[in-house]
Regions:
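Glycine-rich loop-to-alpha-helix module at the N-terminal edge of alpha/beta enzyme cores
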Residues: 56-145
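Conserved small-residue-rich beta-alpha loop and adjacent elements
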Residues: 146-221
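Short acidic active-site motifs
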Residues: 157, 234-235
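Periplasmic-binding protein-like
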Residues: 187, 247-251
């Protein structure tokens, strides 16, 4: 369920709840998160933002409301980073390892943000952050190990099955576990060489927007990970309709998932749609070969030989 209201922000305006701070007290800070496109924070096309409220009703921050034009910009940035697919698996793993290390340095901050945003207790929020860090380390290790295979054929010859990245993947992340769900989907996609446009949890997007500075400081090339906040179902449909997006992953409602599949049919886009609850903290359901298979396509090469 979306918290807050949608409001247009083109220039700073006086806050309605502003009060003169007491002696020794700092004034409130108006914090609005932008989009993350092409390695930089970008203002949304229409200038809209949405308030994100704590369960108590307190204002936590505001996030940008992305639209169709913002998705187009993100797709262009993702295509501009196609060199990521040519980077060796070892080097991609190093980048993910560095990302995990930098997230670990701010674990307390992320846990506090998740707790304040969702109302969960501090211990539960910290466990989600720790699981997210472990998952990034896991996919850093997988980056140079998800290889292909060699098959024998009935005729004289062998067939090489080579795993290749899909290209540009649009990912609509689940509402549950806002940080862990995000990392569990983006991690495997980029580990095998894809670039992504990620739509974080609509109700709890701050776990993803806090990652902007972590991505900035972790040597992630510009355009490899793009984050567009906003109405998840509407943005997912835009991704599904875009001819330059090679695959779409959608984790949300059954109705919107069916719409994503229909919108993808026109350009024969590969889809991965789930509307059933998934335990992201359980490694049997939240990570593994299933995710790597969805992030890759197999190229088969037949090599004949004689006596």
């Amino acid at each position: 369920m979306e918290r807050g209201t949608r409001n247009k922000r083109r220039a700073p305006v006086p806050r309605s709840d502003f009060r003169v701070p007491r002696s020794g007290e700092l004034p409130p800070i108006d914090r609005t998160y932008k989009l993350f496109i092409g390695g930089t924070q970008a203002r949304p096309d229409e200038g809209y933002s949405r308030k994100i409220l704590a369960p108590s009703g307190a204002l936590l921050a505001e996030v940008a409301e992305g639209n169709r034009k913002d998705i187009r910009n993100a797709v262009e940035a993702a295509h501009a980073a196609e060199g990521w697919a040519k980077t060796s698996g070892h080097n991609r793993g190093q980048v993910l390892y560095y990302l995990a290390e930098n997230l670990a340095q701010r674990a307390d901050e992320f846990a506090e943000r998740i707790s304040g945003m969702t109302g969960r207790d501090a211990g539960d929020a910290r466990r989600e952050v720790d699981a997210s860090i472990a998952r990034l380390f896991s996919y850093a290790a997988w980056a140079d190990k998800y290889d292909g295979a060699v098959h024998q054929t009935p005729i004289r010859g062998v067939t090489l099955a080579m795993n290749e990245p899909m290209g540009v993947i649009g990912i609509a992340c689940p509402e549950a576990a806002p940080l862990l769900g995000f990392v569990s989907l983006v991690g495997p996609a980029v580990a095998v060489g894809n670039t992504v446009i990620a739509i974080p949890s609509e109700a709890h997007p701050l776990a993803a927007t806090e990652l902007y500075t972590v991505l900035d400081s972790s040597d992630v090339p510009a355009g490899v990970i793009n984050i567009v906040t906003g109405a998840k179902d509407a943005l997912a449909k835009v991704l599904a309709e875009h001819d330059d997006v090679d695959a779409v992953w959608y984790f949300g409602s059954q109705t919107a998932g069916a719409e994503v599949e229909r919108a993808s049919a026109g350009n024969m886009k590969r889809t991965w749609v789930e509307w059933h609850a998934r335990d992201w903290a359980d490694s049997r359901h939240g990570e593994g070969r299933e995710f790597l298979r969805e992030a890759t396509q197999v190229k088969n090469i037949w090599i004949p030989y004689g006596e």
